[in-house]
């Protein structure tokens, strides 16, 4: 059995919960969730009235009447809810088409079964309104009795009668509005008559009465007026009620918006009831019994007030429909159609903001000391003045909240009564529905923002005041207690002394009744020795009364009794000729009036949490039963575009207004208000279900739009950050500004991890993360998709897009938990499990089908450009995917800017492209591409090229000696031209053969350039890695200083960065192994100087295995000199062909094939080891040497000699360069360790003349 816990311990344990730190630092930009605390209801509805035996009996009786009237008002509220939320049942029931229909009996039976409970409710409603009118008129009759007319009637009683008047007005309007009620009753009646359910005359009569009651408009009002007019002097009592409402309204003696609007409705409907055949309000005004000009002023200021739900009432309508309006029309300004400034919310915003700022600052001071810092003193240590300040602060806060909520509802009401049209708003279509014209098209941008801001202020302040609820509650109870006790024990002591002394028994009995009702004496009873009780003066030493201090409020009955009894003392009416007021002294009257006025708000403040909720309740912005009724069944429910909460939320999202972005959740909270109201006040599950369905849809839309915006915003931010600053400034000089994105407040929204909506806790951050991840993936997918639909030059744009996405990912990762960028990229690149991705495949695809056959390399610029004369077919690519700007560079302006940047990379393939390819493909991708390129080279060298080599070898002259210098360059040219005639005239040489060689050359060049780019990347890697591997640059030392000492200091400085020892000390075995391997690999890479190009050349050498490349063994055992059997002689012949200058309109071999052709030829020669004999025995070089010597210029067989020689010289330089590069790579494997070349000695050749002898 657990040990017993005392109440004190339990309470202290609960208090300790406040000390618990809550983990998240989520910014508060949403209203408070529904409280899990109980809201205690201290209102006993006078059930405890009989306990106050010491009170004046008359007021206890009045409390009894009050109690039953309050119950009737509650019942009236239930009927109002029933009527307002009534949905037509008969529309859903199948109709009987004709009398011969076989299942009509069944249909009628079902109709009766379904509708009977509903019709019973209507019947009860009819009885209720009958009873309520009788009850009300009975009270009026009692109070207007000639004997009672001068009697005092309490304000509370008059206000209750006013509430009755309001109830009748509301019920009548609801009954008038609901056609579906009448339709349902008619359907029931038809079915019941057919089934002969109503056989007895009484039920038939009742049914008929109900039909008439429902059919007659204003039936309740008419009945009420008829019954009131037979009561003599009824208008006097109604005048009292109206005057009280005017007084309350003028002095702001109301707290919740519904109380304020009730006062106005009672004024209007009260005047309507008074102005009939018996009495005339204008005569009463003339007698100063009522003040119509004041009421007119109020009705002018506030022309439309909420009646019930989305039903509104124009207050002037009560006046316009009254009996004597026409002849007094000119007296009313409220009846004119001009709009009141009250409804221009934008003008009111300055004042609202000022009030908000002032109050929030004041509240923050108290909040910080009470709640946040915990430095607030213990409750018992506060002074009365401090409690009073908190009390005033609570009241002021509630009044502000109520004022703002009322303001929102009044603007909304005005708009519902005054829908827009196509003339007032050009965006409003002709066929717009009534509700749509009242909501969707009826607000300007400024008005929507103003509403959003006010709603945010209301809900934000509600949060702050809710947090201080316990502090406020204690201060309120303490202050109310102190005020009541001080007033009853101290302030009323002097009037009591006077009353006893002057023997004013009535006043004495009332004052003593008050004291007995509320006094909480320190000793437990009234001091017996108090001289005031004997009507004597206090002794000179004074009579000290100690008033205790507690935090206990009075009960509702207690407060009512005290206020009513005090009121009876200062009232202008009294049962006798002389009023009690005249017997009291001036200061006493002022004290009583002051206390009476202040105590008006005590009931509200004692129920602080409930009042706070009522003052912030904006639930009616969603309900639309009245407008649904107007559609006559065409609409079951309106779409979200017409729903106020979504209109405001969507407006913030659509305008992307930064200052409003943090308010977006407050607009969504309107659904919480409506759902709470539907369940707790309307008690209608179907309304809650409709709200829930709308919330599901709206929240999806909200997350979808918000995530899209956030992604687009950060994408533009990334695009702007990475955009070349020089381009931006250049554009600015040209007058085209590329704007940076305006700052927005998405961070606060991204930190929301538990948004409260309809009782669900939603992790907004997670939902946005999901959407943004999808958008990120789509962006990467699109970037790769664009690359796949373009040629190799677009690889630079791909890299740019990936960098922007990487930056976007980095910016978003501050707030969202996204997958790593590399993981996303691999997924988009289809490279998670596959060995190579889409980019690698497309790079090879482009190389194979477009780059190798169609690009010409220029060694001077180190670039490939597209050939002027393509030999391959046009390559068909996929269509480029369409994309919105946020999936590319961010915005249209950025897309344009980046397109112009990447446009300069479009017409060539060079180092920038190769660097990007290296980065994107990585070692694995490069290896795959090179392997595939080697296959291409192999198929060409062992296929078509080999065939051409064989064919051309056959048409080569068997022997072609180099002629002697004496022949002169023209002669030599003619000799070679004649010797190589078959080669020169070979048609396919300059087309297919050269094209195939160009492809081989381009492939080899691609490998070479990739390796050069890769080396740059590697060096960069190595330099970045150096500090972490203890590889430090040698330090500069002055003379006389020791290097090793300085290096040691430097090493110790960088020791914390040295990764391997660090991991060995702190890491797991697996981490240690990885670190060691990584370190070793990086160092090895640095030392080895590995060459990939050498491996590629070695591989290509193995492809040249056919004997035709090398020819037969030389007959002299050394080398072939004059015979044309080796490849280098064939290449010399080819070189002779392309060195012949072309005609004016023909393309040169450089234009058609670029340097790739020469790279292919020279590479084959070098790999065959024929480069030196080629340099010595080449036909063109020989011609060059001779021409250089004799300097002749002739045209031999249409070939200008000098021009040809110039071309030969150019190609000689190119060949030498290529052969040197290739030699360097091939010899790099031999290493530096073999400085001595291997020399083979041959016998010197013997001249023929000597050989024979």
Curated annotation (Swiss-Prot):
<dbReference type="GO" id="GO:0008360">
    <property type="term" value="P:regulation of cell shape"/>
</dbReference>
<dbReference type="GO" id="GO:0050890">
    <property type="term" value="P:cognition"/>
</dbReference>
<keyword id="KW-0771">Synaptosome</keyword>
<keyword id="KW-0217">Developmental protein</keyword>
<dbReference type="GO" id="GO:0030371">
    <property type="term" value="F:translation repressor activity"/>
</dbReference>
<dbReference type="GO" id="GO:0030032">
    <property type="term" value="P:lamellipodium assembly"/>
</dbReference>
<dbReference type="GO" id="GO:0030027">
    <property type="term" value="C:lamellipodium"/>
</dbReference>
<dbReference type="GO" id="GO:0098794">
    <property type="term" value="C:postsynapse"/>
</dbReference>
<dbReference type="GO" id="GO:0001726">
    <property type="term" value="C:ruffle"/>
</dbReference>
<dbReference type="Pfam" id="PF07159">
    <property type="entry name" value="CYRIA-B_Rac1-bd"/>
</dbReference>
<dbReference type="GO" id="GO:1905274">
    <property type="term" value="P:regulation of modification of postsynaptic actin cytoskeleton"/>
</dbReference>
<dbReference type="GO" id="GO:0031252">
    <property type="term" value="C:cell leading edge"/>
</dbReference>
<keyword id="KW-0966">Cell projection</keyword>
<feature type="modified residue" description="Phosphothreonine">
    <location>
        <position position="1234"/>
    </location>
</feature>
<dbReference type="InterPro" id="IPR009828">
    <property type="entry name" value="CYRIA/CYRIB_Rac1-bd"/>
</dbReference>
<keyword id="KW-0133">Cell shape</keyword>
<keyword id="KW-0597">Phosphoprotein</keyword>
<protein>
    <recommendedName>
        <fullName>Cytoplasmic FMR1-interacting protein 1</fullName>
    </recommendedName>
</protein>
<comment type="subunit">
    <text>Component of the WAVE1 complex composed of ABI2, CYFIP1 or CYFIP2, BRK1, NCKAP1 and WASF1/WAVE1. Within the complex, a heterodimer containing NCKAP1 and CYFIP1 interacts with a heterotrimer formed by WAVE1, ABI2 and BRK1. Component of the CYFIP1-EIF4E-FMR1 complex which is composed of CYFIP, EIF4E and FMR1. Interacts with FMR1 but does not bind to related proteins FXR1 or FXR2. Interaction with EIF4E stimulates FMR1 binding. Component of the WAVE2 complex composed of ABI1, CYFIP1/SRA1, NCKAP1/NAP1 (NCKAP1L/HEM1 in hematopoietic cells) and WASF2/WAVE2.</text>
</comment>
<dbReference type="GO" id="GO:0097484">
    <property type="term" value="P:dendrite extension"/>
</dbReference>
<keyword id="KW-0524">Neurogenesis</keyword>
<comment type="function">
    <text>Component of the CYFIP1-EIF4E-FMR1 complex which binds to the mRNA cap and mediates translational repression. In the CYFIP1-EIF4E-FMR1 complex this subunit is an adapter between EIF4E and FMR1. Promotes the translation repression activity of FMR1 in brain probably by mediating its association with EIF4E and mRNA. Regulates formation of membrane ruffles and lamellipodia. Plays a role in axon outgrowth. Binds to F-actin but not to RNA. Part of the WAVE complex that regulates actin filament reorganization via its interaction with the Arp2/3 complex.</text>
</comment>
<keyword id="KW-0221">Differentiation</keyword>
<dbReference type="GO" id="GO:0048471">
    <property type="term" value="C:perinuclear region of cytoplasm"/>
</dbReference>
<dbReference type="GO" id="GO:0051388">
    <property type="term" value="P:positive regulation of neurotrophin TRK receptor signaling pathway"/>
</dbReference>
<dbReference type="GO" id="GO:0048675">
    <property type="term" value="P:axon extension"/>
</dbReference>
<dbReference type="GO" id="GO:0099578">
    <property type="term" value="P:regulation of translation at postsynapse, modulating synaptic transmission"/>
</dbReference>
<dbReference type="GO" id="GO:2000601">
    <property type="term" value="P:positive regulation of Arp2/3 complex-mediated actin nucleation"/>
</dbReference>
<dbReference type="InterPro" id="IPR008081">
    <property type="entry name" value="Cytoplasmic_FMR1-int"/>
</dbReference>
<dbReference type="GO" id="GO:0051015">
    <property type="term" value="F:actin filament binding"/>
</dbReference>
<dbReference type="GO" id="GO:0030833">
    <property type="term" value="P:regulation of actin filament polymerization"/>
</dbReference>
<dbReference type="Pfam" id="PF05994">
    <property type="entry name" value="FragX_IP"/>
</dbReference>
<keyword id="KW-0963">Cytoplasm</keyword>
<dbReference type="GO" id="GO:0031175">
    <property type="term" value="P:neuron projection development"/>
</dbReference>
<feature type="region of interest" description="EIF4E-binding">
    <location>
        <begin position="724"/>
        <end position="732"/>
    </location>
</feature>
<keyword id="KW-0770">Synapse</keyword>
<dbReference type="GO" id="GO:0010592">
    <property type="term" value="P:positive regulation of lamellipodium assembly"/>
</dbReference>
<comment type="similarity">
    <text>Belongs to the CYFIP family.</text>
</comment>
<keyword id="KW-0009">Actin-binding</keyword>
<feature type="modified residue" description="Phosphoserine">
    <location>
        <position position="583"/>
    </location>
</feature>
<dbReference type="GO" id="GO:0043005">
    <property type="term" value="C:neuron projection"/>
</dbReference>
<dbReference type="GO" id="GO:0031529">
    <property type="term" value="P:ruffle organization"/>
</dbReference>
């Amino acid at each position: 059995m657990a040990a017993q816990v005392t109440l004190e311990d339990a309470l202290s344990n609960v208090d300790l919960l406040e000390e618990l730190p809550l983990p998240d630092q989520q910014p508060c930009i949403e209203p408070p969730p529904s409280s899990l605390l109980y809201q205690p209801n201290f209102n006993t509805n006078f059930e405890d009235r009989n306990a106050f035996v010491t009170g004046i009996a008359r007021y206890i009786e009045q409390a009894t009447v009050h109690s039953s009237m309050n119950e009737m008002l509650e019942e009236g509220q239930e009927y109002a809810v029933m009527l307002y939320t009534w949905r037509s049942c008969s529309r859903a029931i199948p109709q009987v088409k004709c009398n011969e229909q076989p299942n009509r009996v069944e249909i009628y039976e079902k109709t009766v079964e379904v509708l009977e409970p509903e019709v019973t409710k209507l019947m009860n409603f009819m009885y209720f309104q009958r009873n309520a009118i009788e009850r009300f008129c009975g009270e009026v009759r009692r109070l207007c009795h000639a004997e009672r007319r001068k009697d005092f009637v309490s304000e509370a009683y008059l206000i209750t009668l006013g509430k009755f008047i309001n109830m009748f007005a509301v019920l009548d309007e609801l009954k008038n509005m609901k056609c579906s009620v009448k339709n349902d009753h008619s359907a029931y009646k038809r079915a019941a008559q057919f089934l002969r359910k109503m056989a007895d005359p009484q039920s038939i009569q009742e049914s008929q009465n109900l039909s008439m009651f429902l059919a007659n408009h204003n039936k309740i009002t008419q009945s009420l007026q008829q019954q009131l007019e037979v009561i003599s002097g009824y208008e006097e009592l109604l005048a009292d009620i109206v005057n009280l409402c005017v007084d309350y309204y003028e002095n702001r003696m109301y707290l919740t918006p519904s109380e304020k609007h009730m006062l106005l409705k009672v004024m209007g409907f009260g005047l309507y009831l008074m102005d009939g055949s018996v009495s005339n309000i204008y005569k009463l005004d003339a007698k100063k019994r009522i003040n119509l000009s004041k009421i007119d002023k109020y009705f002018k200021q506030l022309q439309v007030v909420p009646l019930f739900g989305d039903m509104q009432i124009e207050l002037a309508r009560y006046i316009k429909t009254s009996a004597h309006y026409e002849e007094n029309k000119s007296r009313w300004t409220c009846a004119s159609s001009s709009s009141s400034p009250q409804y221009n919310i934008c003008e009111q915003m300055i004042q609202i903001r000022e009030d908000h700022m002032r109050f929030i600052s004041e509240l923050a001071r108290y909040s910080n000391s009470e709640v946040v810092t915990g430095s607030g003193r213990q409750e018992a240590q506060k002074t009365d003045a401090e409690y009073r300040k908190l009390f005033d602060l609570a009241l002021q806060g509630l009044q502000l909240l109520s004022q703002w909520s009322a303001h929102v509802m009044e603007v909304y009401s005005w708009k519902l009564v005054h829908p827009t049209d196509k003339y007032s708003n050009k965006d409003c279509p002709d066929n717009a529905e009534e509700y749509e014209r009242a909501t969707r098209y009826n607000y300007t941008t400024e008005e929507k923002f103003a509403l959003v801001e006010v709603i945010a202020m209301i809900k934000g302040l509600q949060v702050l005041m809710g947090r201080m609820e316990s502090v406020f509650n204690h201060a309120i109870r303490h202050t109310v207690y102190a005020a009541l006790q001080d007033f009853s024990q101290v302030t009323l002591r002097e009037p009591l002394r006077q009353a006893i002394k002057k023997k004013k028994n009535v006043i004495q009995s009332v004052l003593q009744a008050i004291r007995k009702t509320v006094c909480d004496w320190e000793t437990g009873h009234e001091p017996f020795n108090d001289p005031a009780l004997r009507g004597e003066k206090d002794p000179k030493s004074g009579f000290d009364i100690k008033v205790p201090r507690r935090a206990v409020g009075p009960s509702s009955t207690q407060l009512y009794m005290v206020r009513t009894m005090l009121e009876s003392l200062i009232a202008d009416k009294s049962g006798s000729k002389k009023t009690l007021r005249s017997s009291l002294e001036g200061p006493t009257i002022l004290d009583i009036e002051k206390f009476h006025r202040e105590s008006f708000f005590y009931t509200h403040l004692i129920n602080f949490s409930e009042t706070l909720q009522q003052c912030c309740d904006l639930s009616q912005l969603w309900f639309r039963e009245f407008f649904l009724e107007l559609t006559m069944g065409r609409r079951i429910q309106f779409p979200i575009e017409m729903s106020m909460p979504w209109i405001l939320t969507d407006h913030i999202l659509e305008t992307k207004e930064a200052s409003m972005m943090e308010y977006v959740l407050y607009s969504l909270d309107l659904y919480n208000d409506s759902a709470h109201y539907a369940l707790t006040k309307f008690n209608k599950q179907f309304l809650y279900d409709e709200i829930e369905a709308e919330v599901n849809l709206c929240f999806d839309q909200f997350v979808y739009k918000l995530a899209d915006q956030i992604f687009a915003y950060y994408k533009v931010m990334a695009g702007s950050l990475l955009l070349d600053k020089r381009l931006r400034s250049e554009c600015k000089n040209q007058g085209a500004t590329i704007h940076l994105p305006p700052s927005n407040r998405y961070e606060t929204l991204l930190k929301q991890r538990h948004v409260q909506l309809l009782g669900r806790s939603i992790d907004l951050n997670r939902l946005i993360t999901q959407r943004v991840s999808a958008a990120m993936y789509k962006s990467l997918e699109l970037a790769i998709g664009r690359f796949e639909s373009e040629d190799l030059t677009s690889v630079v744009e791909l890299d740019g897009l990936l960098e922007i996405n990487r930056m976007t990912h980095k910016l978003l990762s501050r707030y969202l938990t996204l997958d790593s960028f590399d993981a996303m990229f691999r997924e988009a690149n289809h490279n998670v499990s596959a060995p190579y991705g889409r980019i690698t495949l497309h790079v090879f695809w482009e190389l194979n089908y477009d780059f190798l056959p169609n690009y010409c390399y220029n060694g001077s610029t180190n670039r490939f450009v597209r050939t002027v004369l393509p030999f391959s077919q046009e390559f068909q690519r996929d269509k480029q995917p369409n994309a919105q700007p946020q999936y590319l560079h961010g915005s249209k302006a950025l897309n344009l800017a980046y397109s112009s940047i990447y446009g300069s990379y479009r017409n060539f393939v060079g180092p920038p492209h190769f660097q990007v390819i290296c980065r994107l493909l990585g070692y694995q991708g490069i290896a795959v591409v090179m392997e595939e390129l080697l296959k291409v080279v192999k198929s060409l060298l062992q296929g078509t090229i080999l065939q051409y080599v064989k064919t051309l070898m056959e048409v080569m002259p068997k022997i072609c000696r180099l002629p002697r210098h004496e022949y002169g360059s023209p002669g030599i040219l003619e000799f070679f031209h004649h010797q190589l005639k078959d080669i020169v005239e070979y048609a396919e040489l300059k087309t297919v053969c050269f094209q195939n060689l160009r492809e081989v050359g381009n492939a080899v060049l691609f490998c070479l350039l990739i390796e050069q780019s890769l080396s740059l990347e590697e060096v960069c890697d190595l330099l970045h890695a150096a500090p972490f591997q203890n590889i430090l640059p040698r330090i500069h030392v002055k003379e006389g200083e020791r290097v090793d000492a300085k290096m040691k200091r430097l090493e110790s400085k960088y020791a914390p960065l040295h990764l391997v020892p660090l991991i060995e000390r702190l890491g797991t075995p697996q981490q240690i192994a990885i670190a060691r391997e990584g370190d070793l690999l990086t160092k090895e890479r640095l030392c080895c100087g590995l060459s990939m190009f050498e491996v590629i050349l070695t591989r290509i050498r193995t492809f040249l295995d056919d004997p035709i490349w090398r020819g037969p063994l030389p007959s002299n055992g050394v080398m072939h000199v004059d015979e044309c059997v080796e490849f280098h002689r064939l290449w010399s012949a080819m070189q002779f062909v392309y060195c012949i200058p072309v005609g004016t309109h023909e393309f040169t071999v450089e234009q058609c094939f670029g340097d790739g052709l020469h790279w292919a030829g020279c590479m084959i020669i070098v790999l065959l080891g024929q480069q030196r004999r080629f340099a010595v025995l080449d036909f063109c070089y020989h011609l060059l040497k001779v021409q250089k010597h004799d300097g002749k210029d002739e045209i031999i067989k249409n070939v200008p000699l000098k021009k040809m020689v110039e071309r030969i010289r150019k190609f000689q330089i190119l060949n030498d360069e290529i052969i040197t590069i290739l030699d360097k790579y091939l010899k790099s494997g031999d290493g530096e360790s073999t400085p001595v070349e291997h020399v083979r000695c041959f016998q010197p050749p013997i001249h023929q003349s000597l050989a024979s002898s």
